[in-house]
Amino acid sequence: MESPIQIFRGEPGPTCAPSACLLPNSSSWFPNWAESDSNGSVGSEDQQLEPAHISPAIPVIITAVYSVVFVVGLVGNSLVMFVIIRYTKMKTATNIYIFNLALADALVTTTMPFQSAVYLMNSWPFGDVLCKIVISIDYYNMFTSIFTLTMMSVDRYIAVCHPVKALDFRTPLKAKIINICIWLLASSVGISAIVLGGTKVREDVDVIECSLQFPDDEYSWWDLFMKICVFVFAFVIPVLIIIVCYTLMILRLKSVRLLSGSREKDRNLRRITKLVLVVVAVFIICWTPIHIFILVEALGSTSHSTAVLSSYYFCIALGYTNSSLNPVLYAFLDENFKRCFRDFCFPIKMRMERQSTNRVRNTVQDPASMRDVGGMNKPV
């Protein structure tokens, strides 16, 4: 998919939003509406499509959405990372994976201002180096996020279905090692994005695009190959693993009443499993539309109507919105995160509440608070 500054040749359109450059064909999320010529080059001068008339309000709306994603996502994910580092009780295996997910989401939210500028200016004005960095962050986010969610699901499966093995496998240290391996694995794609990414002047429309640069004579081949690889390795296989893990967990949860030795541990186990399931489900809901859209476009089955293009932009925005949703989910679904968030945001209020609770506990903790002296109970 070309990363055209214009979705259709002949009329200005949104440029390749580099942080949307998650799927290749010069690795833009924007589909290659311009057809390739016989040599594989994209958008030849003799093959032009009628432009779709996109409302000027669409870039403004997208910019507003990305602004919210930027603020909520960056602040929220930074807060998640802070409380995991700050509070010892939060350094569990599951939370180590959550830290990794928050790091990837926080990084990708930093690209939102650049995306917004590209939508509004219809060109990439930030230079070649920043273009490479932004594209690389996109790829890192895409692969580290889905790989981390997959490992979180495997971690939950082991905790629920193999509690004895979980004692050795589910440790914070091993979770950290797995996170490092995830980033190293994602680097095979992220570093490639740095090498291939760059700016290109589109003289026919007088704009600059930021995208992966493939040889023109092999463009169509690389386009299809990269799209299929991304779809299979960054979506289909991880989602299938997640589905298998949660299917086995559901069967296990239905077959036994008590998973661990105590009801409190069992309740915590089910609560954390539910949290991970919701986070995974929201991720899949947010990213499935754009993956399907890209796959359909790669097969040449999309029309070039205004409605289709508008839907495409909505799918892109929905995918990036996921980066700001996870901190909200933690705050509502996990009591430990909720308590730590409140402790950070309202330290004085929380300190006063703890002092009040401690005073109440001290007054009722010992029923023998009266000492019998001379046949009479007197306060000590």
Curated annotation (Swiss-Prot):
Query: Which subcellular locations apply to this protein?
Result: Cell membrane
Residues in the Cytoplasmic compartment per record: 86-95, 155-173, 248-274, 334-380
Q: Which PANTHER family is this protein grouped with?
A: KAPPA-TYPE OPIOID RECEPTOR (PTHR24229:SF1), NEUROPEPTIDES RECEPTOR (PTHR24229)
Which keywords fit this entry according to its UniProt record? Behavior, Cell membrane, Disulfide bond, G-protein coupled receptor, Glycoprotein, Lipoprotein, Membrane, Palmitate, Receptor, Transducer, Transmembrane, Transmembrane helix
- Its family? Belongs to the G-protein coupled receptor 1 family.
Q: Which residues lie on this side of the membrane: Extracellular?
A: 1-57, 120-132, 197-222, 297-311
- Which SUPFAM superfamilies has this protein been placed in? Family A G protein-coupled receptor-like
- Keyword Lipoprotein recorded: yes
- Provide the membrane topology annotation: Multi-pass membrane protein
Chief site of localization: membrane
Which cysteines are cross-linked by disulfides?
131-210
The protein depicted here goes by the name: Kappa-type opioid receptor
Assembly and binders = Interacts with NHERF1. Interacts with GABARAPL1.
Residues glycosylated per entry: 25, 39
Annotated function: G-protein coupled opioid receptor that functions as a receptor for endogenous alpha-neoendorphins and dynorphins, but has low affinity for beta-endorphins. Also functions as a receptor for various synthetic opioids and for the psychoactive diterpene salvinorin A. Ligand binding causes a conformation change that triggers signaling via guanine nucleotide-binding proteins (G proteins) and modulates the activity of down-stream effectors, such as adenylate cyclase. Signaling leads to the inhibition of adenylate cyclase activity.
Extract one GO BP annotation from the record: sensory perception of pain
CDD domains attached to this UniProt entry? 7tmA_Kappa_opioid_R
Q: What is the species of this protein?
A: Rattus norvegicus
Classification via Pfam families: 7tm_1
Glycoprotein found in the keyword field: yes
Which residue ranges does UniProt annotate as crossing the membrane? Answer: 58-85, 96-119, 133-154, 174-196, 223-247, 275-296, 312-333
- Record lipid sites (S-palmitoyl cysteine): 345
